[in-house]
Design a protein with these regions (language model features):
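A long amphipathic alpha-helix within ATP-dependent nucleotide-binding catalytic cores
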Residues: 201, 243-303, 341-342, 346-350, ...
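Glycine-rich phosphate-binding loop of ATP-grasp-fold ATP-dependent ligases
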Residues: 147-148, 166-191, 217-218, 240-258
């Protein structure tokens, strides 16, 4: 029987932006990856394994799994070469993670081809979110946000940002608020330098009008055998630059009710979004995928941005979705956060469920705050 092995590589968006297979994450990103490497255990299939940094983390995964009645086991990097009949499920696929696994001794035939990795990179380009927007717009009468525009010339970007103060300028390969410029003052040298640098590296930029935000949420999917399966919903908060801040943890029904209370047509739009994901992504991609969406105020009317971005990978929203549905006691609601502490975490706080191990050298942790 094929053994499924999950792994956490949160730098995958940056690896896709870099291209090729030689991206090296900065030290802080490597540290975060090591400290939070157990996160996939919360959405991994029963009987699978999670790649962790060392023996101490493996013991934490095994003991936590046993305590909760899971059948998840940890595996350390030095054991990967022995996985002769395994399928790998990284946080996200790229040429970089493929090369890292091969370097650890994983047989190349167990991994996707280089052509498949290039296909993933092309699908991760933000212009496919424009295709999503058009697909949904053609199949609904609901009022939706303006469709983003892609430009390959700085003057066109500047003209757009000048006409639409507060717009968002986005690099084609980026995610979770990274590679995004909130253009409050587009006439500055800083704005010009950022845009021209991004155009040189990634050849185009996507421009979106700023919206009066009401609620950030996402639909979480799994793509398999050419079809997209809706796993659930996530509701989260983002900062001024659209970077993920925290997420609500609760049952699938509770999260649905939060969104539907502000946007009753959620029931009608969800099948259309699912169809769009199947049509645009699932034919050439297998794995997790999140569609970030936005409710916004337009002159007193609540409207929908149906595709702020598509994350072609697992997401923190997937973690909150699965934990809320399968881990928290019925009726319990919490808030998911990732915390950094330069001095570590010598004292575990009450009213927290820690989703990653706290060890003497831990500086990043993921937890659910209760109460």
């Amino acid at each position: 029987m094929t053994q499924r092995i999950y792994l956490f590589n949160p730098d995958n968006d940056l690896a896709l932006a870099h291209g090729g297979g030689h991206y090296i994450a900065p030290p802080f990103a490597q540290k975060m990856q090591n400290d939070l490497c157990a996160l996939p255990m919360w959405y991994a299939e029963p009987g699978s394994m999670v790649l962790v940094a060392d023996e101490a983390m493996r013991e934490w995964v095994d003991s936590t799994s046993e305590r909760l009645g899971f059948t998840i086991k940890g595996i350390t990097p030095d054991s990967l070469a022995k996985a002769n009949d395994a399928s790998f499920c990284p946080w996200g696929w790229s040429g970089t993670i493929k090369k890292r696994l091969i370097k650890r001794g994983v047989k190349a035939h167990l991994l996707p081809s280089d052509a498949a990795m290039e296909q993933v990179r092309l699908l991760a380009h933000r212009r496919n979110s424009i295709a999503m927007h058009h697909f949904i717009q053609e199949r609904t009468s609901l009022p939706l946000s303006p469709v983003p525009v892609e430009y390959d010339d700085f003057n066109e970007v500047l003209d757009f940002a000048t006409k639409h103060p507060g717009s968002y300028i986005k690099m084609p390969w980026s995610g979770s608020g990274q590679g995004v410029y909130h253009a409050i003052e587009p006439g500055t040298i800083e704005f010009e330098r950022w845009c021209k640098g991004a155009l040189k590296r990634q050849e185009s930029l996507l421009c979106e009008v700023g919206l009066d935000r009401i609620l950030d949420f996402a639909l979480e999917f799994k793509c398999e055998n050419g079809k997209a399966e809706l796993l659930g919903y996530s509701v989260f908060e983002s900062d001024f630059h659209s970077q993920y801040n925290s997420g609500i943890v609760g049952s699938k029904q509770h999260l649905y009710d939060i969104i539907a209370s502000k946007f009753p047509p959620l029931h009608d739009i969800t099948p259309t979004v699912t169809e769009a994901v199947s049509h645009i992504y699932a034919a050439n991609y297998e794995g997790f995928l999140g569609v970030d969406m936005l409710l916004y105020n337009d002159g007193g009317t609540t409207k929908l941005n149906p595709c702020v971005e598509v994350n072609l990978r697992a997401t923190m929203g997937l973690v909150t979705c699965m934990v809320g549905e399968h881990i928290l006691p019925k009726g319990t609601v919490g808030r998911f956060k990732i915390e950094y502490s330069k001095s570590g975490f010598p004292v575990l706080q009450e009213n927290r469920i820690y989703l990653t191990p706290i060890l003497p050298d831990t500086h990043y942790c993921a937890y659910i705050g209760l109460g």
